[in-house]
Amino acid sequence: MPSTFHVSTPLAASPGVMFEFHSDPHNIVHVMPPSLKVLELRTDGPAQEGRLIEFECRDWGFIPMRWKCRWARVEPPEVLVDEMIEGPFATFVHEHRFESLPAGECIMHDTVTFAFGRSWWGWLISEIGVRAYLHLLFAYRHARTRKWAREHRA
């Protein structure tokens, strides 16, 4: 049974600027915490429905992870959805939604649907361990994204 995690943050940049930033997979290195190193990233370009993203990373310096994701939904400048098709989770779908605000700003909504496994043990691990990890990860990512938005406001 998948779980859902949601977090939102106001950004001092337009939905278009933030959509463009998040549609380029190479920008992931700008928002990842120092404990999560992206070692290799492969893609054929920016977000396009069906396009693949593959990356290898190390979490905490010693936990290797390989992810293969696909852009499932791309609706400029409001919605980007990527889904893991191979990797450490049974289910992992990440939606970015950019809600327009006055004065050229926006609110970024991140919703992650995830399951570590398909059994009740997997659900328990997801609810206790993964959810806590996502809180830490996205707090860092949103702080870095707010900083980036202030510096690249348009």
Where are these regions (language model features)?
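Hydrophobic ligand-binding cavity/cleft-lining segments
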Residues: 1-49
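Glycine-rich portal/gate segments that line the openings of hydrophobic small-molecule binding cavities
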Residues: 39-86, 143-146, 151-154
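Intrinsic-disorder/low-complexity, polar/charged segments enriched in Ser/Thr/Lys/Arg/Asp/Glu/Gln
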Residues: 2-8, 52, 66, 79, ...
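A non-catalytic, amphipathic alpha-helix used as a structural packing/dimerization or gating element
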Residues: 136-144
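Beta-strand/loop substructures that line and gate deep hydrophobic ligand-binding cavities in soluble
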Residues: 83-136
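Hydrophobic/aromatic beta-strand elements that line small-molecule binding cavities or substrate pockets
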Residues: 7-9, 41, 66-73, 84-85, ...
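Hydrophobic pocket/interface hotspot
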Residues: 17-22, 28, 53-55, 71, ...
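A short, structured loop/turn motif at beta-sheet edges
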Residues: 15-16, 44-47, 73-77, 97-107
